Amino acid sequence: MPTGSLNEIVHAALSGQVVSFPTDTVPALAVSPPYSSLIFAAKKRTFDKPLILMAASAADLWDYVKGNQEEREIWQQMTEKYWPGSLTLVLPASEKVPKALNPKNPSTIGIRVPAHAIAREILGRTGVLATTSANLSGQEPLLTPSAIMTTFPSVTVLASTERQAWGIINSGQPSTVARWQCQGWDVLRQGAVFL
């Protein structure tokens, strides 16, 4: 599939197609959550490596997690400190999360709000998307549109002209992943944010 404008990326995502756009960390593959299996197939990804939900704001994500009032206050403090940004929180999943996002452990879900203007513009128009880094499973993230198009020819990739207009820069470093564990955080992957 060719590159697309921002409007074409939004339309493709809303139509259940896999798209790619830059984030503050590495470029993402993204799809509407009910179509998550398309990303697993494209990446040749095993089901023990879940996808995450990405949104334009924290408010868009709270319905996808469940916890008591005290836990939610702790989680919101983390998001107020680090979001938008390069921190993925793994929290207990609500019934709203499609099991296809985390087939091996549907009781949890990773959530993130990127600190990237164009990613948040797209997510603001599409709503929450299931995402992962743009790469084949087990390989390094792809950082350029041409590499993404070569590896994933059926994915609509945000056009270079759109990237230039927005001054797009990826850090190239993945997000930090922290999982909530009974009153505390367990860092599963150290990335751009240090906890």
Regions found by a protein language model. Give the residues of each.
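Active-site-adjacent structural elements in enzyme catalytic cores
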Residues: M1-L195
